Amino acid sequence: MRAHLGTPRVPAQLHALIADDCLGEHAYGYLGAHQPMPPQPSWEAGFRVMWNLLLDDVVASGCYTPPESDRLRELYQRHQHHFEHPVEPRLLHMDLWAQKLLVDEVGNVTRLLDLDRALWGDPEIEFAVLDYCGISEPAFWRGYGQARDTSPSAEIRRRFYLLYEVQKYMPIRVWRRGDPGRAGVSGA
């Protein structure tokens, strides 16, 4: 996929928005009107809640057994300290790829679609989504205007973020197939 030259500016502009200024509170996590989780006071707490809620969904969909989920929870606990770094709660789209951008006839990005997965947190998790979509290339980083953190702690976070992204699709696939027995949902 060939990204438009303006594409890196879109997440850079989103990431410039801080929850404190936009919401009037210092909060992390999915904080939309649908209230999927309570606001959290730190990124580590926010991601921990997100991680555990996702694992609950993966188990409910029948994709993991409870012992498999427990091993992933324990893995996070062992690496939790890597998420305890100071980071402002930035606005993250979490589903940014070419089809989510509207451009005018000369190629300027004019609209951003689908903010239903947006959250407040560490931009590094958004970069994992961009990696997954094949957007995070050297040209992206030049356009974004900030170098990527390549520290050992950032690499560990990146692996968790990528695993988080991939695991999201496990229950989605089961539940969209309409298999209520396997999904643990009655009447779906």
Residue positions per predicted region:
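A cross-family kinase active-site recognition segment
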Residues: M1-Q77, H81-P89, W120
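A glycine-centered beta->alpha junction motif in the catalytic cores
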Residues: M1-R2, N52-A60, Y164-P180
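Alpha-solenoid HEAT/Armadillo repeat architecture
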Residues: P36-M37, R117, D149, W175
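Active-site Asp-x-Gly
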Residues: F47, P89-L92, W97-I156, K168
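Start-of-helix signal in alpha-solenoid helical-repeat scaffolds, especially tetratricopeptide repeats
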Residues: I156, F160-Y164
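Structural helix-adjacent loops and short alpha-helical linkers that scaffold large soluble proteins
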Residues: G62-P67, A147-P152, G178-G181
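ATP/Mg2+ or Mg2+-diphosphate-binding catalytic cores
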Residues: R142, Q146, Y169-A188
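Hydrophobic core segments within long, regular secondary-structure runs in both alpha-
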Residues: R73-Y76, P138-W141, S186
